[in-house]
Design a protein with these regions (language model features):
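Short, non-transmembrane alpha-helical segments in secretory-pathway proteins
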Residues: 14-18
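Structural alpha-beta junctions
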Residues: 19-26, 87-94, 114-126
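Acidic-and-aromatic substrate-binding clefts and catalytic sites of carbohydrate-active enzymes
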Residues: 38-43, 69-72, 102-105
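Conserved catalytic cores of phosphodiester-cleaving nucleases, focusing on short active-site segments
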Residues: 51-72, 82
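Short, charged, amphipathic alpha-helix that recurs within catalytic cores of restriction-modification
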Residues: 73-97, 103-114
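Domain-level recognition of nuclease-like catalytic cores that cleave nucleotide substrates
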Residues: 96-136
Length: 136
């Protein structure tokens, strides 16, 4: 099934953010599903993040969600799986979630609860469609 235009735009926002926080010489290692790069690998739980970066000291998983996607059971299971993957990584970890502005308050509350429930130290970055950043 093809991705919606909105989802593609949200993925691009996450990609741009990730490329800005990785070392300059490693930007080409940022993986995302496009003609320009290798598709991200499947991680625990058999999920494929929209954006992926890994080196010895840093793991970044990125996911874009539209208004219709965020509340779905599949999305919630993805987020838990991504945080489990981050919990098993020895180094700095980020989960970057890009979504429409109206979901930001809900997402912040959800991820605060989820981090506490999972005893997770991963930095969760929420980006709205304008690229505004919120950290949980």
């Amino acid at each position: 099934m093809g991705e919606s235009r909105k989802h593609i735009e949200l993925v691009q926002i996450a990609v741009e953010y990730v490329k800005n926080i990785v070392p300059a010489e490693m930007k080409m290692l940022v993986q995302y599903d496009s003609a320009d790069t290798k598709r991200p690998p499947m991680i625990s739980g058999n999920y494929i993040p929209d954006v992926y970066f890994w080196n010895n000291t840093l793991l970044i998983l990125g996911e874009a969600k539209t208004v219709d996607d965020f509340e779905r059971k599949h999305s919630r299971e993805q987020f838990k799986s991504y945080l489990q993957e981050c919990n098993h990584f020895f180094g700095k970890t980020f989960l970057v979630v890009s979504l429409p502005w109206q979901l930001v308050p809900t997402a912040k509350n959800y991820f605060r609860r989820l981090k506490k429930e999972m005893n997770c130290s991963t930095t969760i970055v929420i980006l709205n469609e304008l690229g505004r950043r919120f950290e949980v």
